[in-house]
């Protein structure tokens, strides 16, 4: 299966205040073109990126007022795929529940499903064909989505779902020489790669001592998080220091050639920001 990251959706309480926060982190693109934004026309959203690729902030509504839809109180990933009908058939054979929709103009097919650890996964197919020249990593901007980290209580079961039902392929974690204190055993940390530099989907077993052992104020193994790659991490850290926003400077510890930091946004969503060094 061909796939790429379309966007990450992050739940927020106040859209405008959150827009200001993320503008500080990655910058807001005032000249966005329209395409995939229409998938979310019934939700209150603010998009960072271009054509719906990149980042979407959304304001959740009360769950009891929802019908024929599902929302997440955690950040979740939207993937652009090339064979949604095949995935749909496999899910039906396994009697796995999902929500399937077509856009009004028939341009997009959309499917929401929960993997075994109940992370929400949104799959989208463009009926005019799969193209990867524009994606959540490469939008012609100074930032991109490096990966989405998913917490799983059974990593192998989650990987089986992604590989056997969605058609993705598991890779091998690439660790730096000065690796931090965490496990890269495939039963505790696995990767569905889009590149040879750990870009893609990360699936991790929650580790309550992760932050403590690595001297972090944050624990990136719990609750999942998106990771954004930017051009100037030191400049961002100076801004965070000025605003007195707490962050954990992990340096290069998990992925070769990537300086990573962790922080919470103004809605207590975990984030990773990194820079290739």
Where in this protein do the model-derived segments appear?
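Structured core of small recognition/catalytic domains
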Residues: 156, 163-253
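Hydrophobic side chains in well-ordered alpha-helices
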Residues: 18-21, 87-91, 158-161, 236-240
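Generic beta-structure capping elements
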Residues: 51, 58-60, 126, 204-206, ...
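Vicinal oxygen chelate
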Residues: 1, 4-13, 33, 44-53, 65-142, 150, ...
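A short, acidic/glycine-rich surface segment
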Residues: 41, 62-67, 129-135, 178-181, ...
């Amino acid at each position: 299966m061909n796939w790429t990251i379309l966007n990450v959706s992050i739940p927020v309480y106040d859209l405008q205040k959150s827009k200001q926060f993320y503008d500080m982190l990655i910058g807001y693109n005032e000249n966005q073109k329209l395409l995939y934004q229409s998938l979310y026309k019934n939700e209150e959203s603010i998009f960072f990126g271009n054509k719906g690729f990149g980042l979407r902030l959304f304001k959740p509504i009360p769950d009891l007022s929802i019908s024929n839809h599902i929302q997440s109180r955690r950040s979740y990933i939207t993937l652009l795929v090339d064979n949604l009908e095949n995935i749909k058939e496999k899910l039906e054979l396994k009697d796995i529940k999902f929500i399937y929709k077509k856009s009004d103009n028939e341009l997009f097919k959309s499917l929401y499903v929960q993997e075994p650890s109940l992370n929400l996964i949104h799959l989208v197919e463009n009926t005019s064909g799969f193209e990867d020249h524009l994606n959540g990593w490469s939008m012609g901007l100074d930032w991109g989505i490096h990966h989405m980290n998913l917490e799983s209580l059974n990593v192998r079961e989650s990987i089986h779902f992604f590989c056997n039902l969605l058609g993705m392929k598991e890779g091998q974690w690439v660790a730096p020489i000065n690796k931090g204190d965490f496990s890269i055993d495939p039963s505790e940390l696995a990767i569905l790669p889009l590149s040879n530099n750990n870009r893609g989907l990360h699936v991790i077993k929650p580790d309550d001592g992760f932050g403590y052992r690595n001297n972090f104020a944050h624990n990136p193994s719990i609750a999942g998080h998106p990771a954004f790659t930017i051009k100037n991490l030191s400049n961002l850290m100076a801004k965070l220091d000025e605003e007195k926003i707490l962050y954990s400077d992990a340096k290069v510890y998990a992925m070769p050639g990537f300086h990573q930091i962790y922080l919470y946004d103004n809605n207590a969503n975990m984030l990773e920001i990194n820079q290739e060094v």
